UniProtKB/Swiss-Prot annotation:
Biological pathway: Metabolic intermediate biosynthesis; chorismate biosynthesis; chorismate from D-erythrose 4-phosphate and phosphoenolpyruvate: step 7/7
Binding site for NADP(+): 48, 54
Amino-acid biosynthesis found in the keyword field: yes
GO terms, biological process: amino acid biosynthetic process; aromatic amino acid family biosynthetic process; chorismate biosynthetic process
Binding site for FMN: 125-127, 238-239, 278, 293-297, 319
Subunit structure as annotated in this protein's UniProt entry: Homotetramer.
Any one GO molecular-function label of the UniProt entry: FMN binding
Identification of the protein by name: Chorismate synthase
An example Gene Ontology CC term for this record: cytosol
Keywords from the UniProt entry: Amino-acid biosynthesis, Aromatic amino acid biosynthesis, FAD, Flavoprotein, FMN, Lyase, NADP
Organism superkingdom: Bacteria
Gene: aroC
Amino acid sequence: MAGNTIGQLFRVTTFGESHGLALGGIVDGVPPGIPLTEADLQHDLDRRRPGTSRYTTQRREPDQVKILSGVFDGVTTGTSIGLLIENTDQRSQDYSAIKDVFRPGHADYTYEQKYGLRDYRGGGRSSARETAMRVAAGAIAKKYLAEKFGIEIRGCLTQMGDIPLEIKDWRQVELNPFFCPDADKLDALDELMRALKKEGDSIGAKVTVMASGVPAGLGEPVFDRLDADIAHALMSINAVKGVEIGEGFNVVALRGSQNRDEITAQGFQSNHAGGILGGISSGQHIVAHMALKPTSSITVPGRTINRMGEEVEMITKGRHDPCVGIRAVPIAEAMLAIVLMDHLLRHRAQNADVKTEIPRW
């Protein structure tokens, strides 16, 4: 099975399944001499961790990460960093009824078509449980980017269902279980989630992730444009069905005179491009959005087929998120951090000696 690694100089490889013994990861390309402890990774893992809110799955995993290699006396050695998170709260019996049935909207059918078999326990490798290791690896990148370059990465929920959420106050994001920046909408979100749980249904969401302090010049045209790699990374997250950079699809309704980010002696006058021009960072905030589908793990009866091709009706049992977009916020932050760190290392490797007289803001 290919496709388990992302990055070129900063490379992250993950392994493990939802109901396996553990999740693991190998992080290559971390420079030596960076102070790093398990506590540095645990904060973001706790933000993603299941069972911490009545609005998310009640699978209770401590997600305690162990650093197995690549760190000595509290600092990175420059060698591969091995990471491990044990699975401790599996209920594989919840999935025995779907052993021979393909859940509609899930990867069951396509995994079996590709591999001829599948781990039906919680989706196996296709489960979003895998993203815990991405968050751990992303925390390493976030720490390096922040401490060495002053780059800050943060994300929030900007829409749930038909409820838009304006970015009014970033401080609010960590003060509520929705990662919501609009305190005025918390009651509406609570009401929606309660209704979904009662109905046994789910809802989609939009997550926005932003990076500030990114220097101009990151990105490798033409196939490894910065926005292309960000889109690739975000699209690799479970349930993501669309990615926008900057204004995204809103540019369809704009004119060139409205959309172009004009430049004065004081700097850029707008940021419709989301901080990336020609696939290269402009020095402005990098802004990306991703749309997450409503999970198909619901108790509303649905039609599907079994291995024999017979039509059956099924209800998904187990513990699931009514809105997977909530816990996707730290995952999006991690993936953006991984891409930015990889591109920063690549830029320094080729262009460290480049000097220009062009203003930077």
